[in-house]
Amino acid sequence: MLMPKRVKYRKPHRPGTQGKATRGNEVTFGDYGLQALEPAWITSRQIEASRIAMTRYIKRGGKVWIKIFPDTPITAKPAETRMGSGKGAPEYWVAVVKPGRILFEMAGVSEEVAREAMRLAAHKLPIKTKFVKRTGLGGDANEG
C-alpha cells in the first residue's frame, strides 16, 4: 500500500475537492493515460487494486506510471464511541483528485491493450474516468 514515510502533521484537516486540476492534467511520461472526470478521495487500496488490474492485463509488456500519491491521512473514531475525547486515529490514506487529473499513464503497449487495461483499472475506482492519448506540440517525433 502507498503511504508517506513521514508526515509533518499526523492529523490534518480534511482536504477539499473544489475546482478543476490545474496541474497533472496532461499525459507526460507515457503514451496513454486515465483521466478523472469527477472529484474524489482515492484511497491507497483503490490505487493498488487498479495497478494490479493493469499490470496483470499487460503482463510483461509496457510500463505503468502512477501519477497520484495518497499523502493525506483520514482519521476515524472507533464504533460506538462517545463524542469528544479528541480526534480519532489515522485510519487510511487518500489522494485528493480533482476533475482533469491524470491518474495513471502507460507506454510500450498498443492502444487496444492500453485501453482495455485502463478500463479494468477504472472499474476499481469510485469515479468516472476517461481514456486519453498523449498530445505533442508539433506531432510525435516518430511520425513523419
From Swiss-Prot:
Keywords: Ribonucleoprotein, Ribosomal protein, RNA-binding, rRNA-binding, tRNA-binding. GO terms for molecular function: rRNA binding; structural constituent of ribosome; tRNA binding. One of its GO terms (biological process) is translation. The lineage of its organism: Bacteria, Bacillati, Bacillota, Clostridia, Moorellales. SUPFAM superfamilies: Ribosomal protein L16p/L10e (SSF54686). InterPro entries: Ribosomal_uL16, Ribosomal_uL16_bact-type, Ribosomal_uL16_CS, Ribosomal_uL16_dom, Ribosomal_uL16_sf. Part of the 50S ribosomal subunit. Binds 23S rRNA and is also seen to make contacts with the A and possibly P site tRNAs. The keyword tRNA-binding applies. Residues 1-25 are annotated as: Disordered. Residues 1-14 have a biased composition (Basic residues). GO terms for cellular component: cytosolic large ribosomal subunit. Belongs to the universal ribosomal protein uL16 family. This is Large ribosomal subunit protein uL16. Pfam families: Ribosomal_L16 (PF00252).
